[in-house]
Amino acid sequence: MQTADQAGQLAAGFSTYQKWVVGLLTFLQFTIILDFMVLSPLGAMLMPQLGITPAQFGLLVSVYAFSAGASGLLAAGFVDRFDRKRLLLVFYGGFVVGTLMCGLVRTYEFLLFARMITGLFAGVLGSTVFAITTDLFPYQLRGRVMGILQTAFAASSVVGLPLALALSNRWGWNAPFLLIVAVATLVGVAAMRYLRPIDAHLQLRLDRSPLHHFLHTVSMRRYLQGFATSALLATGGFILMPYSSAFLVNNLGIEFGRLPLVYLVTGACSIVAGPLIGRVSDAVGKFLVFCFGSVVTITMVLIYTHLGVTPLGLVILVNSLLFVGVSSRMISASALVSAIPDAADRGSYMSISSSVQQVSGGLAAILGGLIVSETHTGALQHFDVVGYVLVGTTLVTLVMMYFISRRVEGRGASPRSA
């Protein structure tokens, strides 16, 4: 049931400060997502230049995910004991340093180490962003906020990836990481100067040791349900996306120089669709939107992973529809899952959830690397099998999200939890 304050806020929409916070967090998410996503299109360049196999490339993706997962678990016991602004700034600074290392290294081994360092800090950042979002916005507005935050993913495709690919074509694969460092530095300075302290949760924190707080969080049954769902949600992106650029170039016949156009149009569709999906999820129900996204995702994955040499226009259409389906799932799922934890456990829950996603994604990337193999021409084999795995996890998460939706709606997303 809504309180009078909540009803008033829903009628008024976002305050000026809330709009600014959403904008800042979106830019921050943009740098984190771009740092992770940029490896996928660079795969077609990195593998031959560094002389590595798809399995080794999968390890580059996985080491980031595993280190992010480890840091999130280690941080889970104490993240609720600090002002979220300070926590954000400390880990964002470490993320910038790690990304700078990626821009300076020249060998596979050092790049592997740099990705591990970057992941250590990025692992806590994602959960902190969502904890801040949950602290500052009521559940009834959260779909809208998640829809806007999701545009960071799309903006990475529209602006970040084409620009990163252009820089890599001109100055080498290190250049995109230096671009991310430049943008992230500006975002960090803005957050330091203008973001207000976010410490209301400190008034709710129970007097537990970090270990006790961690054990309490991982022992709650409804939290475990959320963790399991988050793990499967992450599997799809990690098992398919890291190998998409190589699949586009070597299987579908798309020239490497045309990849920026594919990501540009696909991302533009996601930018338009993201906020609309968020509004619709708040209006008609988040689980209904999740169902729609799951159906679209399954359909497009089955089409995409079975394509042969394909005209550029059709590739862009299939990719765009696939991203709309994925966005629908992630926006609605993020809003639903954010309502699971109590306010006093929010940072810890989000940190563990993020860690579970990262570890699950890392395992999925390794699995994808083991399933996919290259022919002597560079074409990928068994990519359809990867698609079948993704379809299977999508169906399972659909069932799991149904029960989460019933639990969240049954609790009414009370202020204590939402």
Regions found by a protein language model. Give the residues of each.
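Helix-loop-helix hairpin linking two adjacent transmembrane segments in secondary transporters
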Residues: 148-195
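A membrane-interface helix-boundary motif in multi-pass transporters
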Residues: 169-181, 372-392
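Conserved MFS/SLC helix-loop-helix module at the cytosolic interface between two early adjacent transmembrane helices
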Residues: 70-106
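Cytoplasmic helix-loop-helix junction between adjacent transmembrane helices
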Residues: 114-154
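Juxtamembrane intracellular "pre-TM" segments in multi-pass secondary transporters
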Residues: 5-15, 196-227
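Helix-breaking motifs and short loop linkers at transmembrane-helix boundaries and internal kinks
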Residues: 51, 83, 104-110, 253, ...
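C-terminal transmembrane helical hairpin of 12-TM major facilitator-type secondary transporters
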Residues: 287-333
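Extracytoplasmic gate region of multi-pass secondary transporters
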Residues: 39-40, 223-264
